[in-house]
A protein has these predicted regions:
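Transmembrane alpha-helical segments of integral membrane proteins
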Residues: 154-167
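Transmembrane alpha-helix interface/packing and boundary motifs in multi-pass membrane proteins
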Residues: 24-45, 120
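Membrane-interfacial helix-loop-helix
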Residues: 1-25, 50-132, 136-143, 168-183, ...
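Hydrophobic alpha-helical transmembrane bundles that constitute the permease/transmembrane domains
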Residues: 125-129, 149, 153-156
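Re-entrant/interfacial helical elements at transmembrane boundaries that shape
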Residues: 36-50, 129-137, 163
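Membrane-embedded alpha-helical segments of multi-pass transporters/permeases
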Residues: 35, 76-80, 157-160
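Small-residue-rich segments of transmembrane alpha-helices in multi-pass membrane proteins
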Residues: 44-56, 154-155
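Central hydrophobic cores of alpha-helical transmembrane segments
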Residues: 41-42, 148-150
Length: 190
């Protein structure tokens, strides 16, 4: 019996580490590369906040720091890929539907500039496409950097904290995993 107690205590910290790894990876890749278009970033953030509020071994400060870093560096990678490869990076995907979305994102960027980088964080697909568009359009690096910091904080930290504080609403805490699953499944289906 002591053997099972020992194994259980040795693996008790894997849950939070796995959560950090999954959330950080999804946030980074959704922000960094075109195949990230299909990842459910916002629902993952909200769900991670819900889980952090209900699990004592998940450190909300560590989670928020990881999310900010993953979102920030993900967008930086997207920007650099756009800067290096230009429009050809965006043309790799020949899907007519995706090309239509890319054109809309380019118009959004041309119209809104700095704010498009911040606002894009809150719009699925657009958050993946605007950084390489900004890079390909030769947006000044420090301008992008500032918008990226604001966007990563507002989106990554903001949505995660919304999930975290939602768990304090009576009745929500008992259904945290069902709610988290609903948000993740809903974003995958849509």
């Amino acid at each position: 019996m002591e053997l099972f107690t020992s194994i259980d205590s040795q693996f008790a910290d894997i849950g939070p580490l796995l959560l950090y790894l999954i959330v950080g990876t999804i946030v980074f890749f959704e922000s960094a590369v075109l195949f990230g278009l299909f990842l459910p970033g916002s629902s993952i953030l909200f769900s991670a906040g819900l889980v952090a509020a209900t699990e004592d071994n998940v450190d909300i400060s560590a989670l928020l720091t990881l999310i900010f870093i993953a979102a920030f560096f993900g967008n930086q990678v997207g920007f650099v890929l756009g800067r290096i490869f230009g429009r050809s990076y965006l043309n790799k995907r020949k899907s007519p539907g995706l090309q239509k979305v890319i054109l809309k994102c380019e118009r959004f960027y041309e119209k809104s500039g700095w704010w498009s980088v911040v606002a894009a964080r809150f719009i699925p697909w657009v958050r993946t496409l605007v950084p390489p568009i900004a890079g390909a359009s030769k947006m000044p690096y420090y301008e992008f950097l500032a918008a990226n910091v604001v966007g990563a904080l507002a989106w990554g930290v903001g949505i995660t904290l919304a999930g975290y504080y939602t768990a304090s609403i009576p009745g929500v805490k008992t259904f945290t995993y069902a709610i988290a699953g609903f948000f993740i499944l809903g974003s995958i289906v849509s």
